[in-house]
A protein has these predicted regions:
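Generic structural signal for well-ordered beta-strand positions
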Residues: 33-34, 60
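C-terminal tail/sorting-segment detector
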Residues: 58, 62-84
Length: 84
């Protein structure tokens, strides 16, 4: 949230149990753009902020991106749009 966003967005998710969460952001053609190290989150609503940079700290172009949030028992996908 927000979507579309510029320059950053918060990706919200709800953890049903304390668990390790892994977040990856991809371009629409499947290229890995940003990978966040797995981290433990508490039960409830949490978020991870993405600043529109890739793993090399370069700004990514405007476009639609897909995120994948994975815990031990769940996988969630979502889309977000970066408008510059």
């Amino acid at each position: 949230f927000p979507n579309p966003f510029n320059p950053s967005t918060q990706i919200y998710f709800h953890a049903l149990e304390r668990s390790q969460i892994d977040l990856k952001i991809f371009s629409l053609n499947g290229d890995l753009i940003k990978s966040y190290p797995a981290k433990y989150f508490d039960i409830g609503t949490n978020f991870i902020e993405w600043n529109g940079l890739n793993d090399k700290y370069n700004s990514v172009p405007s476009g639609v991106y897909v995120y994948k949030i994975q815990s031990m028992n769940h996988i969630m996908f979502g889309k977000m749009t970066l408008l510059k």
